[in-house]
Amino acid sequence: MSKKFVITWDNMQHYCRELAQRQMPAEQWKGILGVSRGGLVPAAILARELGIRYVDTVCISSYDHDHQRDMTVLKAPEHDGEGFLIIDDLVDSGDTARKIREMYPKAKFVTVCAKPAGKDLVDEYVVDIPQDTWIEQPWDMVLSYVEPVNRKQK
């Protein structure tokens, strides 16, 4: 993928707060399921914003670094999803989303970002991302000191 879309920590907080606003009233939710690993940070933010204490994970492995591969379910709470909010950072090809829908047909499924191939599989999302764009998540980056321009030239 040649294009990149960078999400900062501030962006992530803002996007998740927007998602949380849409999930009111919070009392309708029994809990939150974060899709590991990308949905873990958004799940924590939604849990805070909505005051939800019951947070669990569904663990599906479908990426090996930046390449998609076969899907493996590593952990899955056993229920149909009724009363649960499922959160992931992104819906891309839709493969993971299809599996989530199959496993939890009664849950509400939201993502922070959505690409065209998968966006119809989620109930809500905040940011549209072109299909050919790689998303740089804040947890994949480090903050580092950058030398001022005037010092580099000496």
From Swiss-Prot:
Protein's GO biological process: GMP salvage; IMP salvage; purine ribonucleoside salvage; XMP salvage
E.C. no: 2.4.2.-, 2.4.2.22
Chain residues that bind guanine: 92, 135
Gene3D superfamilies: 3.40.50.2020
Main localisation: membrane
Entry binding sites for 5-phospho-alpha-D-ribose 1-diphosphate: 37-38, 69, 88-96
Cofactor: Mg(2+)
Membrane protein topology class: Peripheral membrane protein
Annotated localization: Cell inner membrane
Keyword Ribosomal protein: no
Keyword terms of this UniProt record: Cell inner membrane, Cell membrane, Glycosyltransferase, Magnesium, Membrane, Metal-binding, Purine salvage, Transferase
Binding site for GMP: 69, 92-96, 134-135
Annotated residues for binding of Mg(2+): 89
Reactions mediated catalytically: GMP + diphosphate = guanine + 5-phospho-alpha-D-ribose 1-diphosphate; XMP + diphosphate = xanthine + 5-phospho-alpha-D-ribose 1-diphosphate; IMP + diphosphate = hypoxanthine + 5-phospho-alpha-D-ribose 1-diphosphate
Family matches, as SUPFAM superfamilies: PRTase-like
Pathway entry: Purine metabolism; GMP biosynthesis via salvage pathway; GMP from guanine: step 1/1; Purine metabolism; XMP biosynthesis via salvage pathway; XMP from xanthine: step 1/1
GO molecular function terms noted in the UniProt entry: guanine phosphoribosyltransferase activity; hypoxanthine phosphoribosyltransferase activity; magnesium ion binding; xanthine phosphoribosyltransferase activity
GO cellular component, as recorded: cytosol; plasma membrane
Residues that bind xanthine: 92, 135
CDD domains cross-referenced by the UniProt entry: PRTases_typeI
Quaternary assembly: Homotetramer.
Function summary: Purine salvage pathway enzyme that catalyzes the transfer of the ribosyl-5-phosphate group from 5-phospho-alpha-D-ribose 1-diphosphate (PRPP) to the N9 position of the 6-oxopurines guanine and xanthine to form the corresponding ribonucleotides GMP (guanosine 5'-monophosphate) and XMP (xanthosine 5'-monophosphate), with the release of PPi. To a lesser extent, also acts on hypoxanthine.
UniProt record similarity statement: Belongs to the purine/pyrimidine phosphoribosyltransferase family. XGPT subfamily.
Protein's UniProt name: Xanthine-guanine phosphoribosyltransferase
Organism listed in the record: Vibrio cholerae serotype O1 (strain ATCC 39315 / El Tor Inaba N16961)
